[in-house]
Curated annotation (Swiss-Prot):
InterPro entries to which the protein is assigned, alphabetical: Kinase-like_dom_sf, MAP_kinase, MAP_kinase_CS, MAPK_p38-like, MAPK_Sty1/Hog1, Prot_kinase_dom, Protein_kinase_ATP_BS, Ser/Thr_kinase_AS
Low complexity: bias regions: 373-389
Residues holding ATP: 29-37, 52
Source organism per UniProt: Eremothecium gossypii (strain ATCC 10895 / CBS 109.51 / FGSC 9923 / NRRL Y-1056)
Residues the record marks as active site: 144 (proton acceptor)
Regulation of its activity: Activated by tyrosine and threonine phosphorylation.
Role, per record: Proline-directed serine/threonine-protein kinase involved in a signal transduction pathway that is activated by changes in the osmolarity of the extracellular environment. Controls osmotic regulation of transcription of target genes.
Gene3D superfamilies, sorted: Phosphorylase Kinase, domain 1, Transferase(Phosphotransferase) domain 1
Protein name per the record: Mitogen-activated protein kinase HOG1
Domain Protein kinase: 23-302
Modified residues (Phosphothreonine): 174
Biological classification of the source: Eukaryota, Fungi, Dikarya, Ascomycota, Saccharomycotina
Length: 447
């Protein structure tokens, strides 16, 4: 039976949350640089969910692309140890909302409240590495792995979240983004050349933090961060120094006094030998010598949980063709709408998700241009109509214009009548219009 949903508005920390009546009992759980996260109850399933509001996703091309990337990744990456996208919708205010499973807490909060017993430490590390094995097999680097991005429920099930900064496995990167405490040394030394090994380093830092209850490398700045890493690992080996491209970085590193490594058995005296061995293999200066997620899962330390028949890899590599695209906001908007329709299994007459990325861009660009022309024609018609009424209703005209400038369309995929680019870039798409006409909400079928 089809269920028609309606939007309602509420304020959370001064931020308007505009969601459908499918979701109730909103409570804030976290705030990030790009959005606010609230817990809620899915009234269809009676299950708790997390709703992440992406604020002003189309305010800039950079933010639009970032939102598009996160949605594409969430749709592609489906694994027990990764957060799962359950719903996505666009509000009349043009904000995008991701709905995912709700986990009880995150590892950062958990470590602040209590030390971890050995069995929990092992199980959490196992699940982190199990998730990373899958992510890396899909050709994806998380790039921002840290305790606050690791969610845990009351059953100790662990899920990695926040793929908004994830990138392709590419030897030429465009910058570094990971939180400093968990940042691999190659990012600081050769930030244009890194790969999936940066996630293994971050996981090693998290492993050590679970052991000690505090960050292993709490650097105050980049220089201090590198310094405290060398306090434990010693000076970087020649093979690593030879990869440094920046002349200033090379001068800095070679000017430092030589430091010998501290044996991990001495630094972590209360840790069992197999745990020390795995940690040491994860925190290696040279990324080429760092253990992989797959190999780490077979390490004796994780033997109680290792199951080679239940540690899957991705069915296909993630398609990163869009990653170097420099597109205008309107085109990203169309691409995003197409992805939302595809998630809801609603056909889009203008963009075929099975087409190549270039073909999708061409279709999206044409749709955006058609929308602009449609809006220009509408504005011209309104202008002509207003001119015809001039001299007839002088007093009423001012009121009419004021009302028209403030009136919002009832269609969430159509812009306002005050000259903005219309959001309905698929005006000829009957299915999309049917969705839009239901009080600014997609109609979702439930049996």
């Amino acid at each position: 039976m089809a269920s028609q949903e309606e939007f309602y508005r509420t304020q959370i920390f001064g931020t308007v949350f505009e969601i459908t009546n499918r979701y109730a009992d909103l409570n804030p759980v976290g705030m990030g640089a790009f959005g606010l996260v609230c817990s809620a109850v899915d009234t269809y399933t009676q299950q708790p969910v997390a709703i992440k509001k992406i604020m002003k996703p189309f305010s800039t091309a950079v933010l639009a692309k970032r939102t598009y990337r996160e949605l594409k990744l969430l749709k592609h990456l489906r694994h027990e140890n990764l957060i799962c996208l359950e719903d996505i919708f666009l509000s009349p205010l043009e904000d995008i909302y991701f709905v995912t499973e709700l986990q009880g807490t995150d590892l950062h909060r958990l470590l602040q409240t209590r030390p971890l017993e050995k069995q929990f430490l092992q199980y959490f590390l196992y699940q982190i590495l199990r998730g990373l094995k899958y992510v890396h097999s899909a050709g994806v680097i998380h790039r921002d792995l840290k305790p606050s991005n690791i969610l845990i429920n009351e059953n100790c099930d662990l899920k990695i979240c926040d793929f908004g900064l994830a990138r392709i496995q590419d030897p030429q990167m465009t910058g570094y983004v990971s939180t400093r405490y968990y940042r691999a040394p190659e990012i600081m030394l050769t930030w244009q050349k890194y790969n999936v090994e940066v996630d293994i380093w971050s996981a090693g830092c998290i492993f050590a933090e679970m052991i000690e209850g505090k960050p292993l490398f709490p650097g105050k700045d980049h220089v201090h961060q590198f310094s405290i890493i060398t306090d434990l690992l010693g000076s970087p080996p020649k093979d690593v120094i030879d990869t440094i491209c920046s002349e200033n970085t090379l001068k800095f590193v070679t000017s430092l006094p030589h430091r010998d490594p501290v044996p991990f058995t001495e630094r972590f005296k209360n840790l069992k030998p197999d745990a020390v061995d795995l940690l040491e293999k994860m925190l290696v200066f040279d990324p080429k010598k760092r253990i992989t997620a797959g190999d780490a899962l077979t390490h004796p330390y994780l033997a109680p949980y290792h199951d080679p028949t239940d540690e899957p890899v991705a069915d296909a590599k993630f398609d990163w063709n869009f990653n170097d695209a420099d597109l205008p906001v309107d085109t990203w908007r169309v691409m995003m709408y197409s992805e939302i329709l595809d998630f809801h299994q609603v056909p889009d007459s203008q963009i075929n998700p099975n087409d190549t990325f270039d073909d999708q861009v061409a279709a999206a660009t044409a749709a955006a241009e058609a929308a602009r022309q449609q809006q220009q024609q509408k504005q011209q018609q309104q202008k002509q109509q207003q001119q015809r009424h001039q001299g007839v209703e002088h007093g009423a005209q001012h009121v009419q214009l004021q009302h028209g400038a403030k009136q919002l369309s009832a269609d969430p995929l159509v812009g306002d009548s005050n000259g903005g680019i219309p959001l309905n870039v698929s005006a000829a798409n009957e299915t999309l219009n049917n969705f839009a006409n239901q009080a600014a909400q997609y109609a979702t079928d439930f049996e």
